[in-house]
UniProtKB/Swiss-Prot annotation:
Gene: avaM
Protein name: Ava biosynthesis cluster protein M
Entry superkingdom: Eukaryota
Pfam families linked: Sulfotransfer_4 (PF17784)
SUPFAM superfamilies in alphabetical order: P-loop containing nucleoside triphosphate hydrolases (SSF52540)
UniProt source species: Aspergillus versicolor
Length: 260
């Protein structure tokens, strides 16, 4: 592990993730978790241990179960484990992706807070045992951390989001030595990142991705795809049950008829 990107989600972590790939690195991001059932389960276990006191806290090589094959890690839920990751990977450099608290909150309201307000997530997770049964508990727990235990979709959680943002950034700045830390905003582009990580600056433009509209659109697409999958499987099950009942009735009627 060479780089810990400890900024919160919606601070340019996706753009930096793509940029690191273009530099030849192998970064890890929530994108790598979202469709990996085992990783979703591991991170949820780690979060329950840290925030709920359930089970043994993750430390040291425990994180290698998820991060062992990568040389950089970013985004939630990894960025919640500041002390643990600093202890597990003491030689890693730290990039703190930044933006103003109010612009971060506005971005969150237009993306993840909107997505978590889709209240049928819970119902979907009961029927979609292949994906949503793992994704929803993790996503919900992530959002509750940033809402400081409040219902993350409610307007009353707004002050808590801002408090968490301030506490998180204060903690990272306090724990990481300045010579090991780069505070970076996506508008700064390649130069600070490449200088900090000892890479030549690419000639291509720095990638700016994951707009608010794009984030919600991606979630909505996945959300309805999972619902369609549930409905299709339900229809298949109903059809199979109907076929079975019909078959039993047919053979039973033949058997009764032949005995007369």
């Amino acid at each position: 592990m060479k780089v810990l990107v400890l900024g919160l989600c919606r601070t340019g972590t996706s753009s930096l993730y793509v940029a690191q790939k273009e530099l030849g690195m192998k970064p890890y991001h929530f994108r790598d978790i979202a469709f990996n059932t085992e990783h979703m389960k591991l991170w949820l276990t780690a979060m329950r241990a840290k925030f709920d006191g359930v089970g043994k806290p993750f430390q040291g090589k425990d994180f290698d179960q998820m991060l062992g094959e990568y040389d950089s890690v970013a985004d939630t839920p990894a960025c919640f484990f500041v002390e643990e990751l600093l202890a597990a990977y003491p030689e890693a450099k730290v990039i703190l992706t930044t933006r103003s608290p109010q612009s971060w909150l506005h971005s969150m309201q237009n993306t993840l807070i909107t997505v978590i307000s889709w209240r049928s997530w819970t119902v979907l997770s009961l029927f979609d045992r292949e994906h949503s049964a793992f994704y929803w508990p993790l996503f919900n727990r992530i959002m509750r951390v940033m809402a400081k235990g409040n219902d993350p979709w409610k307007a009353s959680a707004t002050p808590s989001y801002l408090e968490y943002f301030d506490e998180h950034y204060t903690k990272v700045r306090r724990l990481v030595p300045k010579d090991r830390l780069l505070e970076w905003h996506p508008s700064q582009g390649w130069e600070p990142v490449c200088e900090f990580l000892d890479f030549p600056v690419p000639e291509k433009e720095f990638p700016h991705i994951c707009t608010s509209d794009g984030n919600v659109r991606t979630h909505r697409s996945t959300y309805w795809k999972r619902w369609r999958n549930v409905v299709q499987k339900g229809a298949q099950t109903v059809g199979l049950v109907g076929l079975t009942v019909g078959g039993i009735w047919y053979f039973r009627s033949r058997l009764v008829g032949s005995s007369r």
